[in-house]
Amino acid sequence: MIKISRKEYVSMYGPTTGDKVRLGDTELIAEIEKDYTVYGEEIKFGGGKTIRDGMSQSVSPDVNELDAVITNAMIIDYTGIYKADIGIKDGKIAGIGKAGNRDTQDGVGMDLVVGASTEAIAGEGLIVTAGGIDTHIHFISPTQIPTALYSGVTTMIGGGTGPAAGTFATTISPGEWNIKQMIRAAEEYTMNLGFFGKGNTSNVKALEDQIKAGALGFKVHEDCGSTPAVINHSLDIAEKYDVQVAIHTDTLNEGGAVEDTLAAIGGRTIHTFHTEGAGGGHAPDIIKAAGEANILPASTNPTIPFTK
């Protein structure tokens, strides 16, 4: 049997079981725990490669062939770190494992048959993960969307109305009209987009109107006054409509200290921004919120972990 060196194998098919990959410019190292391929039966598209009629491409007329296959991808998800082919059918993942031609290759899954209608996407040397969710977006410009997609982000949650002072500061799309216009503008983009309404009000109708207009929740921001009253009202309406609330707490402590904010939250679930304190809020006391079971703490650009 002809053999190639490990270096040549990685160059052709990407890393395999036991290989370690550094993640970007971080100090994090990912080790591949399992490779679903059958060595010697790998599929690959291109000149002199295997995705050809009768080879890795099935000629059987009755098989349920894939619409697309991502070949030899390194996958990182909640189940582990592994190497596999990813089959796509009708716009959804049909299977993960060994893809190819069941008539000529060993180990090919029933739902991973490559046929004449299958598009090939090269995954060699690339990492595949679930789409990232960015939960803190100031919607200033449409150019943010392609930049996020290039980074693997497929869901963006935040607020704003474009390059306005309120947008730069608060991640809020305030009011029924602004929310509807942002949703209308979002229709043309291949990105999952969600918009926060303005939670800084004690006006129950104003809160409800924003949810009915399409807001996925409320943002309470200190620039509009993160007082105990508006925290309580926004959480009341959020519970009624089963939506979320995010908060940027009060840096100046003019509406109360961190203890007053936690009392207004009252054990209800809330997403606290800048919980490390570097980006604002009850700095540095807001870090106390990270110890509360009902609070989802978050950090943003002022604190970037896993880098030098």
Curated annotation (Swiss-Prot):
Keywords attached to this entry: Cytoplasm, Hydrolase, Metal-binding, Nickel
Ranges of residues in domain Urease: 131-308
Single Gene Ontology BP annotation: urea catabolic process
Post-translational modification N6-carboxylysine, affected residues: K219
Pathway listed: Nitrogen metabolism; urea degradation; CO(2) and NH(3) from urea (urease route): step 1/1
SS bond partners: none
SUPFAM superfamilies (UniProt xref): Composite domain of metallo-dependent hydrolases (SSF51338), Metallo-dependent hydrolases (SSF51556)
Entry-linked Gene3D superfamilies: Metal-dependent hydrolases (3.20.20.140), Urease, subunit C, domain 1 (2.30.40.10)
Protein's UniProt keywords contain Cytoplasm: yes
Positions annotated to bind Ni(2+) 1: K219, H248, H274
Annotated Gene Ontology cellular component terms: cytoplasm
Highest taxon in the source lineage: Bacteria
Compartments where found: Cytoplasm
Post-translational changes noted in the entry: Carboxylation allows a single lysine to coordinate two nickel ions.
InterPro entries on file: Amidohydro-rel, Metal-dep_hydrolase_composite, Metal_Hydrolase, Urease_alpha_N_dom, Urease_alpha_subunit, Urease_asu_c, Urease_Ni-bd
Family: Belongs to the metallo-dependent hydrolases superfamily. Urease alpha subunit family.
PANTHER family reported in the protein's UniProt record: UREASE
Protein name: Urease subunit beta
Name of the gene encoding the protein in the UniProt record: ureB
